[in-house]
Swiss-Prot record:
InterPro entries reported in the protein's UniProt record: EF-Ts_dimer_sf, Transl_elong_EFTs/EF1B, Transl_elong_EFTs/EF1B_dimer, Transl_elong_Ts_CS, UBA-like_sf
GO cellular component: cytoplasm
Organism: Streptococcus pyogenes serotype M5 (strain Manfredo)
Keywords, ordered alphabetically: Cytoplasm, Elongation factor, Protein biosynthesis
Record's subcellular location: Cytoplasm
Lineage of the organism: Bacteria, Bacillati, Bacillota, Bacilli, Lactobacillales
Chief place of localization: cytoplasm
Summary of the function given for this chain in its UniProt record: Associates with the EF-Tu.GDP complex and induces the exchange of GDP to GTP. It remains bound to the aminoacyl-tRNA.EF-Tu.GTP complex up to the GTP hydrolysis stage on the ribosome.
UniProt similarity note: Belongs to the EF-Ts family.
The protein's name: Elongation factor Ts
Gene3D superfamilies assigned to the protein according to its UniProt record, in alphabetical order: 1.10.286.20, DNA helicase RuvA subunit, C-terminal domain, Elongation factor Ts, dimerisation domain
Amino acid sequence: MAEITAKLVKELREKSGAGVMDAKKALVETDGDMDKAVELLREKGMAKAAKKADRVAAEGLTGVYVHGNVAAVVEVNAETDFVAKNAQFVELVNATAKVIAEGKPANNDEALALVMPSGETLAEAYVNATATIGEKISFRRFALIEKTDEQHFGAYQHNGGRIGVISVVEGGDDALAKQVSMHIAAMKPTVLSYTELDAQFIKDELAQLNHAIELDNESRAMVDKPALPFLKYGSKAQLSDDVITAAEADIKAELAAEGKPEKIWDKIIPGKMDRFMLDNTKVDQAYTLLAQVYIMDDSKTVEAYLDSVNAKAIAFARFEVGEGIEKKANDFESEVAATMAAALNN
């Protein structure tokens, strides 16, 4: 039987990423054959990964990487926040973002087929990471954004990498683009403009807003406060030319009823129309970047601020770890019951 030296174990660990005991055991089982030991560890890693495949991985990190005029943001998941801080995991996330920005895959299948600097595919890297780290490690999603030479990327990560953002801004500079990305991280817009919102979505969100007003009015009635008006519109998409014209006519009628001189109406109407737009675009303000109040200057929307500095938001992508993933929340009694049931069935 071949002698299993510390040098052999170290070499196998460097090739496979396995722990000391796993590497030594593999060398013993293969009589010191390095190639067979690597293959054995790979097979065991795949088996370990398969056993963990049905686990929920909702923790993790985002990765952001800029490669010339291409930028990538990725989300990689682990089962626990503790593992998400593991150096090997962080390195995998960053390497994933880099290889995707450079490879520009069209979908997850193409992304997983990309070759890492180590020579393994991205898919193999995740199988090996699951085996060596001991938790299910999964590549969830990515977004690619491209720009021209004249445009600027804003790359930003927040909360230790749990949120990753890339934005593209035309005009301004990299610092402005980064500020826009910071706004996106904080305010969570889902699309750039109201033109991207679905009509039924707007209708449903408006109904939710009015339901909240209804509940608020019930509370206000208890303390003799006047009721708040319900919203008729929620988005610019609903504000046709006829609606705008009617709103202006209502304002003029209101000014006339108040006895305001007609010669000063032109100074009053713009402000009241701005208020009308603000009150009737609440859905836009919640979900569209351009309509949100800019966190760096709360006197303006993002669109108005960018206009004031001769800049324009072109595109963005925002990932937050775990969004949309349903986490399992078993209590201690449930875990004990599940363990006992499994033991009885074996």
